């Protein structure tokens, strides 16, 4: 079913036979959705008010008639009478969704014959998601169930919604596409009234898109619906016939994708420029970075979203496809794309025409001229329109020509030579522009700068190896300018000390200038002046006004030119500070200066000393707003940052430069009202990333940047705070922190002021920009691959309250279930292939292939986990033979693995290690859709000592007597007992396996802390210790997670007494085994015997003291403390059996 190898003439057959959904699955889904529809209508949405279901509309690819075989989607939009406005939809969904989920749980027990039901994690709030799949999992459909406000009501066919529907939508201040569900009916009608063959072309495009998805793991691709709209546009502009060549249509769509940076497409079938509010909004939308593809049903939803999606990945693949078999005629000639307004021309890289929807709907300047950007620099006009950039072109407004005339005109002039030849097409519903951006402007973005600031070169275009020099050359302020600023600040302070009425105690310099994170072009300085008259937090506000008036008067009188080449300008004032600007005569830089009178809460502190606890208890009891008294702690804030290594502060400059470019791109646009998070939040995020993921003086700048960008994308999970200045041991601080930790994420607390949480601002927009930057060269290594981020989680275990540990495990440690299912399916395929094909022409036989490691036990952690594939071979007849002929055996298994890789189809990315080691064979299975999710496998040939063992039965004692007589090193033949090791853990309750995950995560954090000091005990030893703690202390399948964790830490602290073993598989009944066990148990503590292999002592010869030290530190952390600050009590478990 490979598209590229299908001849152009066979594409219709490919669509008919391979892309249309399986009829029996479609019928089963239709029956299931009909049944669910009845249940929902009958029961309503539950709850106290029992809202009435007005109607239910089906959307998504399934309803639009563009569903692909394999996997597709459907949207069930439930219009309820209790939702009377767009605002209601935001606030009322929690109770409604809870009631609907209860209905779904009942209905999902039996969704219909041939179907399975499983809930999925919601991609957005206000939505319930589940999956219906065929029993063989070959076909599935993701169902999104959305309660919605019936904005449209009962629409008549071909009747536009009233304009007030859209003006009401825009006045609701919604996010882009937030209420798209309300317009599902329009979206569905827009697509499924199209000719059958056009929908076949859509299937072909989506099949190509799916093939790209399987090859790209990390990139965030545009939604497939964007490609449906692009396909419709291509057909409208270039064909409009019911019968056409699929190859030609596909070639046209891919050419548009290749030229995506010039796309600006919209339709006016449902909304237009007639209404002033809608018209003004559309004008702003059409100025967004390319590509712009507006949903024909909801103008707030830009499917192109040039700043969020990796269109460049699709464009690269589109370009690669043009010479493939699917675009070759039988004669060998290449298929040419359609020609038409706004479409690429054969052999010409630029798009054919800049086009607008119609003269009366076009964007007009003050003189009534249409503003369209030129296709080439040579087309720039000599007299640009007033108020427009120099690159804008003036085109005289002209009456609407008829459709027929427009098409004739366009056919004659595909690539216009003069602007006057450009025509206006009333039927095309599109405006396409060509930008002439500078080399420093990234694809899809306009180059914007704030007056008085220097943006510098575009970060996305800087190779990763040049980032250090880029920071030095373009981001660091000049030492001469910094000296000027210091001189000006000293002059200002001297003036205030001498001239002001009130006595100044001391001064603190803060802001980015004080912290050493100021960027070239524009920086901020915070001068906090501590006055004797401001004696406490509560009294600070009462005297501030008169002090500020005095300050302003003195500065205006005495300090107009505080330093040579710098002038002082007063700007808009706020109630608690004086705001000024230091402006150099050449206007090359700008310094925003805030002067704040404040209460000296901290006093002069010695280096490294903490403020007194009463400082913070006084702050919390003052009843202040969040961050209201942040200025009082400016010195602590400055010291927290400027004591960091120079390279870490360079990384902060890089992050802030990216942040500044994002802010400039959206300045004055539709998102301008939704301010970005404060830049200081990104400084703290950068410190957190470095502390948790690196901690070294020298590091890769690209890796650090990518880590910060990844954390920005995880903003909904961020929980970050430090206790360098305040402590959880203080009851008032602890109670305050626990309240803060109950808030929605992100949570980033100022390390100097615990009341200041930097959750404000449009984190979603910043996350979209972070995702867009991840595909650029600044984050690519020399071989073109993305540099790896540091291993940093968005929240820390020791900062998680004890009562939240189950949630912490579920959110951050539990692997994705769908990925685990994919891995299991892939491993089953590999095992079967190896068993059937290895040593086919040899006397050696593969007896069985067994999966081991954390993945098999059910204790794998989210992210990168490990597993073993143990291949039991007939050529090994005893333990001592296991090492013989290893190189030849590994070579044969590798050859078959490579054959399996080529011949079999996998839902995951299957990579065999290229490491040249004749004794080791490894491969990795990686998710194609989830970032950072993979399992590393080691393939291990082994002697089948156990044979076919029945479940629950003990091995023959002779197995262990042979083992004892054969082994030389502890655990030498442990691979032979993989099945027993796996079953010992996998049979345990689910919650116990969650506790094992928690202990393993803690262990991995400890490994980072003690790196270089010695080898910690093996991780498997801690798994066994956790099982022992539960067996001896609880045995309840539903135990308290904090108590279980605390017990394991307690046992680690008692490592000198540890003696743990089991007799589930071996015992003292046999004399040889009994004597051996006595010898093992008499060895120095700790002793933890492998329950499957008595030769394996997992407590021997490791730095338990380092682990015990870390365990002791954790017992006083929030995760081991109840809400009153008392330590969680461990279970009563003895350290020895």
UniProtKB/Swiss-Prot annotation:
Record keywords, A-Z: Acetylation, Antiviral defense, ATP-binding, Cytoplasm, Immunity, Innate immunity, Magnesium, Metal-binding, Nucleotide-binding, Nucleotidyltransferase, Nucleus, Repeat, RNA-binding, Transferase
Intracellular or extracellular location(s): Cytoplasm; Nucleus
Stretches for region Disordered: 434-462
Positions that bind ATP: 854, 997, 1000, 1019
Activity regulation (record text): Produced as a latent enzyme which is activated by dsRNA generated during the course of viral infection. Strongly activated by long dsRNAs at least 50 nucleotides in length. ssRNA does not activate the enzyme.
Spans annotated as OAS domain 3: 800-1134
Residue numbers of N-acetylmethionine PTMs: 1
Gene3D superfamilies: 2'-5'-oligoadenylate synthetase 1, domain 2, Beta Polymerase, domain 2
Residue sites binding Mg(2+) per the record: 866, 868, 938
Enzyme Commission code: 2.7.7.84
GO terms assigned for molecular function: 2'-5'-oligoadenylate synthetase activity; ATP binding; double-stranded RNA binding; metal ion binding
Any Pfam family matching the protein: NTP_transf_2
Disulfide bonds: none
Interaction with dsRNA as annotated region, ranges: 12-56, 185-199
Record comment regarding domains: OAS domain 3 is catalytically active. OAS domain 1 has no catalytic activity but is essential for recognition of long dsRNAs.
Complexes and interactors: Monomer.
The family this protein is said to belong to: Belongs to the 2-5A synthase family.
Protein name, as recorded: 2'-5'-oligoadenylate synthase 3
Natural source organism: Rattus norvegicus
Highest classification ranks of the organism: Eukaryota, Metazoa, Chordata, Craniata, Vertebrata
């Amino acid at each position: 079913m490979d598209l590229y190898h299908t001849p152009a003439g066979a594409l219709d057959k490919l669509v008919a036979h391979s892309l249309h959904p399986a009829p029996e699955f479609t019928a089963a889904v239709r029956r299931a959705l009909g049944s669910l529809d009845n249940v929902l209508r009958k029961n309503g949405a539950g709850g106290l008010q029992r809202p009435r279901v007005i109607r239910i509309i089906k959307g998504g690819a399934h309803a639009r008639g563009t569903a692909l075989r394999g996997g597709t989607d459907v949207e069930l939009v439930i219009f309820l009478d209790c939702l009377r406005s767009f605002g209601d939809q935001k606030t009322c969904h929690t109770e409604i969704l809870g009631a609907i989920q209860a209905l779904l749980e009942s209905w999902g027990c039996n969704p219909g014959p041939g179907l399975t039901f499983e809930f999925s994690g919601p991609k957005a709030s206000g939505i319930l998601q589940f999956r219906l799949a065929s029993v063989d999992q070959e076909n599935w459909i993701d169902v999104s169930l959305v309660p919605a406000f019936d904005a449209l009501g009962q629409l008549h066919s071909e009747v536009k919604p009233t304009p007030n529907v859209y003006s009401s939508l825009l006045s609701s201040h919604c996010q882009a596409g937030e209420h798209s569900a309300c317009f599902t009916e329009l979206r569905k009608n827009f697509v499924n009234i199209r000719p059958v063959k056009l929908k076949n072309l859509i299937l072909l495009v989506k099949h190509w898109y799916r093939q790209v998805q399987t090859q790209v793991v990390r990139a965030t691709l545009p939604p497939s619906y964007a490609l449906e709209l692009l396909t419709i546009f291509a057909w409208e502009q270039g064909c409009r016939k019911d019968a056409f060549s699929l190859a030609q249509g596909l070639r046209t769509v891919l050419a548009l994708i290749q030229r995506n940076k010039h796309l600006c497409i919209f339709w006016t079938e449902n909304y237009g420029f007639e209404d002033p509010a809608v018209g003004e909004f559309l004008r702003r939308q059409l100025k967004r970075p390319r590509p712009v593809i507006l949903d024909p049903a909801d103008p707030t939803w830009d499917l192109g979203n040039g700043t969020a999606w990796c269109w460049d990945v699709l464009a690269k693949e589109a370009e690669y496809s043009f010479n493939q078999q699917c675009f070759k005629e039988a004669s060998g000639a290449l298929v040419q794309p359609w020609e038409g307004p706004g479409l690429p021309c054969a052999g010409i890289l630029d798009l054919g025409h800049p086009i607008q929807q119609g003269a009366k709907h076009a964007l007009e300047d003050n003189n009534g001229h249409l503003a369209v950007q030129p296709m080439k620099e040579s087309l720039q006009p000599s007299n640009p329109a007033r108020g427009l950039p120099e690159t804008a072109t003036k085109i005289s407004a002209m009456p609407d020509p008829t459709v027929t005339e427009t098409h004739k005109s366009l056919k004659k002039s595909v690539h216009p030579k003069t602007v006057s030849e450009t025509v206006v097409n009333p039927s095309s519903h599109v405006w396409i522009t060509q930008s002439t951006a500078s080399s420093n402007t990234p694809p899809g973005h306009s180059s914007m700068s704030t007056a008085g600031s220097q943006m510098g070169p575009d970060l996305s275009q800087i190779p990763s190896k040049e980032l250090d020099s880029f920071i030095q050359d373009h981001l660091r302020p000049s030492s001469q300018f910094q000296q000027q600023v210091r001189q000006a600040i000293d002059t200002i302070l001297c003036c205030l000390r001498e001239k002001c009425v009130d006595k100044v105690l001391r001064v603190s310099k803060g802001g980015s200038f004080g912290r050493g994170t100021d960027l070239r072009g524009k920086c901020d300085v915070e001068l906090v002046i501590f006055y004797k008259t401001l004696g406490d937090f509560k009294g600070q506000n009462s005297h501030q006004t008169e002090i500020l008036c005095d300050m302003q008067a003195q500065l205006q009188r005495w300090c107009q030119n505080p330093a040579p080449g710098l002038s002082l300008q007063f700007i808009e004032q706020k109630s608690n500070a004086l705001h000024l600007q230091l402006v150099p005569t050449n206007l090359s830089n700008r310094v925003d200066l805030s002067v704040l009178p404040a209460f000296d809460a901290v006093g002069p502190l010695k280096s490294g000393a903490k403020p007194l606890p009463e400082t913070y208890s006084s702050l919390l009891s003052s009843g202040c707003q969040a961050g209201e008294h942040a200025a009082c702690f400016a010195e602590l804030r400055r010291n927290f940052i400027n004591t960091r290594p120079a390279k870490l502060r360079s990384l902060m400059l890089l992050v802030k430069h990216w942040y500044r470019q994002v802010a400039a791109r959206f300045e004055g646009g539709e998102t301008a009202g939704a301010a970005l998070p404060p830049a200081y939040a990104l400084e703290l995020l950068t410190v957190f990333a470095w502390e948790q993921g690196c901690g070294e003086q020298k590091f890769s700048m690209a890796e650090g940047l990518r880590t910060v960008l990844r954390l920005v994308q995880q903003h909904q999970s961020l929980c970050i705070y430090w206790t360098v200045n305040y402590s959880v041991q203080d009851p008032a601080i602890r109670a305050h922190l626990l309240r803060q930790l109950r808030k929605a994420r992100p949570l980033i607390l100022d390390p100097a002021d615990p009341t200041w949480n930097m959750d404000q601002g449009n984190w979603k927009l910043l996350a979209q920009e972070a995702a867009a930057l991840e595909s650029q060269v600044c984050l690519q290594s020399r071989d073109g691959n993305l540099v790896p981020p540091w291993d940093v989680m968005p929240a820390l275990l020791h900062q998680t309250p004890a009562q939240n540990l189950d949630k912490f495990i579920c959110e951050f440690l539990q692997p994705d279930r769908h990925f685990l299912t994919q891995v299991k399916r892939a491993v089953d395929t590999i095992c079967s292939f190896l068993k059937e094909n290895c040593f086919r022409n040899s006397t050696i036989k593969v007896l069985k292939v067994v999966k081991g490691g954390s993945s098999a036990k059910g204790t794998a952690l989210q992210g990168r986990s490990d597993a073993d594939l143990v291949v039991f071979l007939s050529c090994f007849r005893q333990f001592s033979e296991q090492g013989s002929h290893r190189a030849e055996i590994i070579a044969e298994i590798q050859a078959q693995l490579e054959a399996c890789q080529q011949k079999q189809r996998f839902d995951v990315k299957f990579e065999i290690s290229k490491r040249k080691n004749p004794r080791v064979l490894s491969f990795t299975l990686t998710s194609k859709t989830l970032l950072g999710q993979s399992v590393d496998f080691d393939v291990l040939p082994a002697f089948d000592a156990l044979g076919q063992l029945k479940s629950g039965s003990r091995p023959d004692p002779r197995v262990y007597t042979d083992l004892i007589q054969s082994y030389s090193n502890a655990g030498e033949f442990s691979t032979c007992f993989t099945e027993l090791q796996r079953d010992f853990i996998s049979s345990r309750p689910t919650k116990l396996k969650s506790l094992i995950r928690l202990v393993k995560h803690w262990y991995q954090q400890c490994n980072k802390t003690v790196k270089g000091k010695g080898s910690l005990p093996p991780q498997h030893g801690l798994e066994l210790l956790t099982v022992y703690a539960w067996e001896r202390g609880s045995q309840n399948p539903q135990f308290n997670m904090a108590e279980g964790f605390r017990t394991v830490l307690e046992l680690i602290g008692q490592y000198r007494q540890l003696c743990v073993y089991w007799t589930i598989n071996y015992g003292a009944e046999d004399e040889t085994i009994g004597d051996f066990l006595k010898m093992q148990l008499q060895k120095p503590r700790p002793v933890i015997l492998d329950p499957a292999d008595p030769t394996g002592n997992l407590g021997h010869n490791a730095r338990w003291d380092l682990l015990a030290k870390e365990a002791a530190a954790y017992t006083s952390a929030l995760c081991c403390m109840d809400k009153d600050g008392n330590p969680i009590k461990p279970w009563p478990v003895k350290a020895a059996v």
